[in-house]
């Protein structure tokens, strides 16, 4: 699981499919269900097309 110390303050921590901690390059980013992709705050993951939508 992620802790506040895992990633810099400008990034968001996401748990990978392997259960490890990964960093998303967006502040207050949204982790996608696949655990690989992430989206900027205010958007949602489009899992089918692997993109972020408003």
Swiss-Prot record:
Lineage top rank: taxon: Eukaryota
Organism encoding this protein: Locusta migratoria
Keyword field contains Disulfide bond: yes
Pfam family, one: Granulin
PANTHER family, per database record: GRANULIN, PROGRANULIN
Keywords: Disulfide bond, Neuropeptide, Secreted
InterPro entries the record matches: Granulin (IPR000118), Granulin_fam (IPR039036), Granulin_sf (IPR037277)
Protein name from the UniProt record: Pars intercerebralis major peptide D1
UniProt modification remark: Six disulfide bonds are present.
GO cellular component, one term: extracellular region
Subcellular location: Secreted
Tissue expression pattern: Brain.
Keyword Disulfide bond: yes
Protein family (similarity comment): Belongs to the granulin family.
Record GO biological process: neuropeptide signaling pathway
């Amino acid at each position: 699981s992620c802790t506040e110390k895992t990633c810099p303050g400008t990034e968001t921590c996401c748990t990978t499919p392997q259960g490890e901690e990964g960093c998303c390059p967006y502040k207050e980013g949204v982790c996608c269900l696949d655990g690989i992709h992430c989206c900027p705050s205010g958007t949602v993951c489009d899992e089918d097309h692997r993109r972020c939508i408003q």
